[in-house]
Amino acid sequence: MDTKNLPFLEKVMAKSGVHDIFDARDLTEVVFRVMRDLMTTEAADRVEAELHKPAETTEDRSLQLEIADLWHDTNPIVAFLSRVRPPWQGPGIFKIDSDRFLFRVENEGPMPPTVERETLVKAVFSATKDELSPDRIAEIATWLPDHIHQLWQEA
């Protein structure tokens, strides 16, 4: 299915098997949150700067967001903490490896039981890569752990 001309959230739905646009929005935000947790604030800001495009074309005000709003996080506390903490990399209990990345995606959002975690992550990655420059795509890849990096490359 060619999704190139679909709005961002509809791309996520089409490629992931998520049937509810609100779930697609919420799950995208979770994937973005975990991605941001791996990155420096400066790197996350460079990504956000390229995502100032509508997430969905709709009359529903709850969906009238830019993709950057989802990247930044609509939860003000989470958005603030993302800006003041260092990347969750390296040794320690907060390190985000591939398993923890997928665990968080599955457990921090409304993950439908019929959707595979990897399929959802690849769908969000694919829709996101459609919006980013080659420089941002390459930069994000440098922050991702092994299996998640592979999903990013495949998306």
Go through the PLM ranges and name each one:
Residues 1-155:
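General marker for long, soluble alpha-helical cores
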